[in-house]
Regions:
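Gly-rich Lys/Arg/Thr-decorated short loops/hinges at beta-loop-alpha junctions or inter-strand turns
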Residues: 1, 21-23, 66, 86, ...
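Generic detector of short, locally flexible boundary/turn motifs and exposed helical patches
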Residues: 13-16, 50-51, 57-60, 140-146, ...
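Non-catalytic terminal/interface segments that mediate subunit docking, oligomerization
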Residues: 145-182
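Terminal amphipathic helices with adjacent charged low-complexity linkers/tails
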Residues: 92-152
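Generic structural motif recognizing short loop/turn segments at the entrances and edges of beta-strands
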Residues: 55-56, 135, 172-173
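Proline-rich intrinsically disordered, low-complexity coils
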Residues: 25, 42, 62, 120-121, ...
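Conserved catalytic cores of soluble enzyme domains
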Residues: 1-117
């Protein structure tokens, strides 16, 4: 494993990130404080996971902000999981605790191939490929100007309603995620 500590400039880590980009899935789980040059590598990975109350990412800390700008901020306000999930968009997933974080990483990996020359995993989820969902006609109104819940539509379309939403809290008007279609 490459650590930013091994090279002050971080160049070797960034080079590894760019070399692996598009070749293997790169996932970062921030399970503590990550500051300075260390924050750049997770931002270059495909998916960033953060945990409420323990994950922090910022270029500098509250003490420097106070001395330079005269503002008092907490680590949560500066670069907590909520900030990076809702405002900056750096975090793709926000978890309540480490266990939820690892379970979501496992679920994400169930959708991804191990590398760019492999197909995504095929999982038998016991959904009938010939299934016709009549309720979709009721979910989508005839009037194109009426609103409807796209999450409900997606859950009816994907196999067994299995959908993993990415960046759920960032730009909530856009839905991006992974699902399976038989």
């Amino acid at each position: 494993a490459l650590g930013v500590q091994s090279e002050k400039s971080g160049v070797s880590v960034f080079f590894a990130n760019t070399e692996a980009s598009g070749v293997i899935p790169q996932i970062s789980a921030i399970l503590g404080s990550c500051a300075g040059i260390s924050v750049y590598s997770p931002a270059l990975t495909d998916f960033v996971f953060m945990v409420d109350g323990i994950s922090h990412m910022s270029i500098t800390g509250p003490r420097i902000i106070k001395s330079v700008m005269g503002e008092e901020v907490t680590m949560e306000e500066l670069g907590g999981a909520k900030v990076h999930s809702r405002i900056s968009g750096i975090a793709d997933f926000r978890a309540n605790n480490e266990e939820d974080c690892f379970l979501t990483i496992r679920k994400l990996l169930s959708f991804l191939p191990s590398h760019n020359e492999e197909l995504p995993p095929i999982i038998d989820i016991r959904d009938d490929p010939e299934r016709i969902d009549e309720s979709l006609a009721e979910l989508v109104p005839d009037d194109p100007h009426k609103f409807y819940d796209m999450h409900q539509v997606i859950s009816h379309l994907v196999d067994s309603g299995d959908f993993l939403e990415v960046k759920k809290e960032f730009a909530p008007e856009i839905i991006t995620g992974f699902g399976r279609l038989a």
